Amino acid sequence: MKRLIIILLFIANPLKAEKIEQLSWYNLQELLEDDKLTYKIIKSCVSLNSAVTELIKDEHPNLANQFFNSANFLSPFGILVLKKIKNIDNIAAEKEFFNDVDRLTKDYMSFMRENGVINKSFFKGTFIGEDLNYCNEIRAAIETTISETKKKN
């Protein structure tokens, strides 16, 4: 029985690791060149910000609101990229995007809770903090692009 449990743990952990991976390995140039990667990163950033929002909202509502706002800012861009990749209408893209985000948010929350039990911190010993910074860089790049576009028009 113990062998079966150990085997299941080895099988289950790589599956989770495939879903939750370090985002900050990718550079912005790669995102500009690959729509599928752009979708993956935006979906992951929305999910990560949503997970942090859920985990801290009771103890730190103001801080949670900042993560919530980041997720909401990035969501429309994820929907637009998915719409382009799959050549689907807006309603189908929204539905698929939010289903993907919901699943990945739950995975991030599980990952952070497990880490919290081990390290007494959601972030310590993981790449989550780096990825939050990376997601903020993505958001800032989008905001800058929008601002520059408005200036030209």
Spans of features found by a protein language model:
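Sec-dependent N-terminal signal peptides
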Residues: 3-14
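Compact alpha-helical subdomains of small soluble proteins
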Residues: 75-153
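Residue-level marker of positions within ordered structural domains that often coincide
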Residues: 5, 50-51, 140
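Extended amphipathic alpha-helical interaction segments
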Residues: 30, 55, 59, 144-152
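Short N-proximal segments of mature Sec-exported proteins
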Residues: 31-88
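Helical anchoring/docking segments at protein termini
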Residues: 4, 17-22, 153
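Generic detector of short, well-ordered, non-transmembrane alpha-helical segments enriched
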Residues: 13, 41-42, 131
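Short N-terminal segments immediately surrounding and downstream of signal-peptide cleavage
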Residues: 18-36
